Each structure stands twice: as structure tokens, then as C-alpha cells.
């Protein structure tokens, strides 16, 4: 039964009609897995947001806009009008829905993009793609919208980031030719390198907010995957400082999970 949604049988050929309903023992887990695959636009419930949190989240958006302006490169400037439009799009589509980490979705997206800005400030397309990727992944915003409203370079980045399901796939053969050409590769907007920046920024942000997750196995998996795969990728292709940040965040996340598990076990015993 664990492999199916359930079983339903009606007994109508009896004096008292009865209904037999059989559900898998892990029905709640199955339901949660099904719901997480749905675009959040399909999930109508929004979590309560205090006036302070709402004000803080709007401040995050404004600070990100100012942050981007400071990092804009003369040779290939970031279009602040495009950034403003993307921030508005985030608010419209995400509303006050939350990520599994407990963060408001649009606050999380901006936090990830902020890391991308710090790492690849002279590549505007990668920054735009880091904002659009989460929209396409988690909402009903179609890829065709990205293709029609942004240039094909941005579309290609979003498409390639969406194509990564497992972090093992980040170690793409095309990255082998980079060697010590990181700065040149960023300027040339090498697609797989851009994908790596976005995915590792996403991972670093989520690990840093591990305390907000309620499903601890998910955090443990992220942390272990980071230590075995992501840290090596960052050290090999990007910057040792990024690798160090990922390792530190992963180890801290594992400690958070361990402490939470101990508290939960203690509560059960009491």
C-alpha cells in the first residue's frame, strides 16, 4: 500500500452498506511530497505575517535594489529598471507564502540573488536569472514569459538551472576547461558556471536558515550533500572562500538538526 495513494471499496450488496477505505501508513508524507511538487500559486493559503515582518521584508527589497546599484559594472551595467520589475514580479507571484525554511519566498529569492551579486557582480544576466529561476520553479510563471520578456541569454541560464535536479549534475564536463580562467569565464557568461553560482548560492542561503525547517531529514540531506559535493565544486571551479562558507553553514546546520532531535526526544520522554 505504501506505493499507492490508497484503496476504496463499497459494499452495497449487504443490509447495511459499508465503505472500506485503506490508506498508506505514510499518507501524510505522501501528501506533503505531492504538494511540494505543485506550484505555490495552486496553494491558496498564506501564512500570517506580522506588520513588523511585512515592513522588514519590504526593507529587504529596497536594500537589495540599493545593493545591486553599488555593484553595477561600467562595462555591462545592471539595469535597475529590470531589477525593479523583477522585485515587483516576486511580490505579485509569491505574496506572503513561505518556503520550507520558514522564510517568505520573495525574501528568500532576494537573499539568494544577493549572494549571486556578490560573487558575479559583472554579469547582469546571471543576476536576473537567479531571480527568475525561483519564480519559474515555484510558481505558475511559464518559461515562455522569460523567453518573451528577457534576452535569450537570461532564458538559457534559467533553463539550465531548472535542468539540475541533483547536485552531482553540477559537475558538468564543460567546467573542466576553466582551470584558472574563472574571471574570463564569468565575463564570457559561461552557462554551466552561471548555473553553479546560482545553485550554490541557493544552497548556502538555505543552510544558513536551517533553524527554520521543520522537516529535519531534508536539512541533514542538504548538509551532507554540501559536504560531499558542493564544497568540492566551489573549491575546484569558483572560490575557496565560497567553499569555506558552504562547509561552515553545512556543519552548523547538522548541529542544529542534532540539537533539535535531542530536544524532540527529550519532549517525548517527558
Segments from the language model and where they lie:
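Active-site helical microenvironments for divalent-metal-assisted chemistry
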Residues: 2, 6-270
Amino acid at each position: 500500500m505504501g506505493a499507492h495513494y490508497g484503496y476504496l471499496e463499497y459494499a452495497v450488496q449487504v443490509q447495511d452498506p459499508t465503505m472500506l477505505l485503506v490508506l498508506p501508513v505514510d499518507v501524510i508524507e505522501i501528501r506533503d511530497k505531492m504538494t511540494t511538487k505543485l506550484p505555490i500559486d495552486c496553494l491558496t493559503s498564506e501564512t500570517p505575517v506580522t506588520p513588523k515582518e511585512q515592513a522588514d521584508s519590504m526593507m529587504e527589497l529596497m536594500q537589495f535594489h540599493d545593493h545591486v546599484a553599488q555593484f553595477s559594472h561600467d562595462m555591462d551595467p545592471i539595469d535597475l529598471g529590470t531589477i525593479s520589475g523583477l522585485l515587483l514580479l516576486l511580490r505579485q507571484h509569491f505574496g506572503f507564502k513561505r518556503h520550507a525554511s520558514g522564510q517568505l519566498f520573495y525574501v528568500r529569492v532576494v537573499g539568494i540573488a544577493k549572494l549571486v551579486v556578490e560573487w558575479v557582480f559583472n554579469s547582469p544576466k546571471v543576476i536576473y536569472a537567479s531571480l527568475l529561476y525561483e519564480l519559474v520553479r515555484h510558481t505558475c510563471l511559464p518559461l515562455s514569459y522569460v523567453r518573451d520578456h528577457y534576452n535569450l541569454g537570461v532564458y538559457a541560464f534559467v533553463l539550465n538551472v531548472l535542468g539540475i535536479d541533483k547536485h552531482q549534475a553540477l559537475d558538468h564536463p564543460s567546467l573542466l576547461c576553466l582551470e584558472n580562467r574563472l574571471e574570463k569565464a564569468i565575463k564570457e557568461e559561461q552557462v554551466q558556471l552561471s548555473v553553479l553560482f546560482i545553485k550554490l548560492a541557493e544552497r548556502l542561503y538555505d543552510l544558513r536558515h536551517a533553524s527554520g525547517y521543520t522537516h529535519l531529514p531534508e536539512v541533514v540531506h542538504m548538509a551532507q550533500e554540501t559536504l560531499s559535493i558542493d564544497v568540492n565544486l566551489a573549491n575546484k571551479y569558483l572560490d575557496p572562500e565560497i567553499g569555506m562558507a558552504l562547509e561552515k553553514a553545512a556543519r552548523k546546520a547538522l548541529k542544529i538538526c542534532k540539537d533539535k532531535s535531542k530536544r524532540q526526544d527529550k519532549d517525548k520522554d517527558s
